[in-house]
Structure formats: structure tokens, C-alpha cells
Amino acid sequence: MRKIKLLLKQHVGAPCAAIVKPGDKVEKGTLVATPTGLGANIFSSVYGTVEEVTDQAIVIQPDDEQPDKYIPIKKSDSKLEMVKEAGIVGMGGAGFPTGVKLGADLQGGYILVNAAECEPGLKHNIMQLEQQAEKTVRGVEYCMEMSNAKKAIFAIKRKNAKAISAIKKAIADKPDISIHLLPDIYPMGEERAVVRECLGILLEPTQLPSAAHANVVNCETVLRVAEAIEDQKPCIYKNISVVGKVHGGPEAQVFMDMPVGISVEDMLDKVGGIDGEYGEIIMGGAFTGLPTELDAPTTKTTGAIIVTIPFLDLHGAKVGLLVCACGGGEARMRDIAQKYNAEVVSVTFCKQAIEVKPGAPRKCENPGNCPGQIAKVLEMKRAGAEYLIIGNCSDCSNTVVTCGTLKMGLKVIHQTDHVMRTIHHPLYRHLTISKTVDQDLSEF
């Protein structure tokens, strides 16, 4: 294993402050950085020696021997304090400190467990539920207790039968915990989509789930809560899917409990390395992930590493970019256009993508439900675009293709195409799946 690099900002809020110095010996569970504001403790994920400390990161040279033993966090009568002490953050999204989220009084409301595994091709959340459903459910109960929630709902796609069966068995004697089945449509894991699907409440783009007396918590986060309370384990591990053009094959290979801060290259070594020429390496999912480098460190929020096939060469073709809140921002879309060797002649935004505040990422007005994009497509055609590069959800992609390709003769490329072709997944074009899901669980 190469050097471990622990970024001091891998959560929502302010960067943490390092409390170690070069030359210090550390173990798994050694506290190495503490919050300076909104944030979460950071612990060493390996046995080793601190090599470098900067304003951005702590670099650790791991020992050759890595015992499983870790330094436990302090025991407390307060479960919430143990969650805060463990440094847990949201492990499926932006990394909001879990101790802060669970401290909100839901007044008898809901914990919504996000098990959608929203990004295509990833499997680490589902594998966790298949293998550790009972402990995950105990984590849900702890979250309910800390948040004063009376009910909990697992939001999971109907296609994941084995995981659904495992959850169903684990909650058989728990009437306050239920399962809501989701369609296999992107972005069903967006937190406002989870609230809408589970509770029938459409929040405004500026509203948090707490407005519906709910907290949306990623299923891995829930498991780490159980580990903190039952095992006094600090947040030092992350479950990661490695996907794409690697020697192990394009299907997702899941690695549980990888040390936070392990490099992308070390993770790729675990699958035999990159298989020949490639387009880019993405940290995160096909929709919301960003290009990364081999020496980049993983964090508490890293869910996937994807290696793609090379990009097609558009030979300078004129393209319009349709930026959506569901996918990459304008900078990411321009990056993709450049990698396709295309000339950007127009940039517009999905009509559902609401600007909440200047400079902040846009929010979808109603995630996964599209009212039509004809005006946006026409705008790009008038600007001279021959191709459209889009980052839309399943439903919006369907409407763009219908009006752009069939009615206006434009060629459509989805920002995820190079990933989907790599993993042999259907391209995002036409919506062929119903958005309504039968909630009958008798077959599971």
C-alpha cells in the first residue's frame, strides 16, 4: 500500500485542523484532526508514521504490518455524542456531519434510509445490505432514537431482490420500519426524490427533508452509526465500487472497509490495474463524479472509481451543452466536450434546474420528472449546434432525444455515454421503464 493521504476537508463545513506532526507514530483510530467549525473528526485509517502535514492534508507512510485492531472511541451514555466522536459524515453524498444531522428533533417523523444506489453500475450499498442487513437495521433504530423519529423507511430499487429479502427478514418483527420500492430510474436517490417517493411530499428546491419531519440517511452511513455505538469504531473505512476498463472486467468489483485516504492507484491495483488505453478515471458515479488522477486520495464520501474507454473524436463538431442539476455542472460538461474534441457553441440549463443562490449548484425542481425541453433544444440548434451533450436524468433525457433527434435532426450524446459503453449498460436515451412501482413485497 502506498501512502495514505487524509484530506482535512472531506465533509460539508470548514477544514479540520491537524493535531499531529511529521514523525508521529499513528495507529488505526488515532485522532489526527479536529473540526474548526462545522465538520467531523478525522482519524488515521492505518498503522504508520506521519510524513507530512499541510493546510490541505495529512500524509501517512503505512507500516508493512496492518493489524485489524483499532483505538476505540470514547464510550458515552449519549449515542449522539458517540456518533459525533466517531467522525461520521454522510457517506453517499456531500458529507454532511451525521452527528449534526441526527441531532435535529424530527418530532415523531421519519428516518428515510437511502439504499437507492442511484448511480448506474455501482454495487457497494446493495452488497452491504445483502451481507449486513441486521446490523444496518440496528443502525436505523439508533438513528430513530437519536432523532426522535417514530418510523423508518428503506428506499431501494425493486430490482435488488436479494437485498430486499435480507432487509425484509431483518425487519420482520419491527413494525415501525418498512420498505418502499423505487423504479430503476435516475435520480431516485436524490434526497428530495426519496422524500417524494416515500412520503408523497415534494419539497421546494430550497427546503431540507426536515421540512417534512424527515432525515434522509445513506445506508452505509447507517451502518457506520451502528459500528460507532456497538463497536466504538471510528469512521476510518469506506466501501468502494471499482468499475470499468480494468483487468478484473467492467462489472463493479466491491471492496468493503477500505482505509479512508487510500489512493486511486492502490484501489485499481486491487483489480489488476487499468486494461490498456482509457479515456478518464472518475471518482464517484457516472452522473455526479469528477475526473481524478492515480495519486488522488479517497475520502469518507468516495463511493466509486470508474475507468472509462477512450472518448470518441468529434473532430471539432459544434456542440450545445444542456446542463442539468442531475448531472455534471457547466465546468464538467465543458471538460467532457473538450475530451470529445468538440467546439462548444451554446450552453443552456435544463428548465427544471433552479438557481438557488448565485454560484451554488443548481437544484432540480422535481427530480426525475421532466415537463419538456423543446425550447432549450431549439436554442442550441439556432446557435449552430450539430450535437447536444446532455447531463439530464432518465426522464429529461427521453424528452431531449424525442425533440432533439427525432424532430430537429440533432445528434445526442449523454455525459455518461463513455461510462455506459464501458460497463455495457444501456445508454440514457429513451425512458422504457415505468415510474410507478408495485409495492407488493410478497415475492421477496
Predicted regions and their residues:
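Iron-sulfur (Fe-S) cluster-binding modules
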Residues: 1-90, 100, 108, 144-159, ...
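Conserved alpha/beta core surface patches that mediate binding of polyanionic ligands
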Residues: 89-109, 123-126
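Gly-rich Lys/Arg/Thr-decorated short loops/hinges at beta-loop-alpha junctions or inter-strand turns
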Residues: 111-125, 248, 354-359
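Structural motif
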Residues: 112-114, 216, 389
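Short gly/pro/ser/thr-enriched loop/turn and capping motifs at secondary-structure boundaries
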Residues: 118-120, 186-189, 353-354, 419-422
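Short, glycine-rich nucleotide/cofactor-binding loops
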Residues: 123-134, 325-327, 367
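Histidine-anchored nucleotide/phosphate-binding helix
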Residues: 130-146
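Hydrophobic alpha-helical positions that pack around
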Residues: 159-264, 270-276, 285, 296
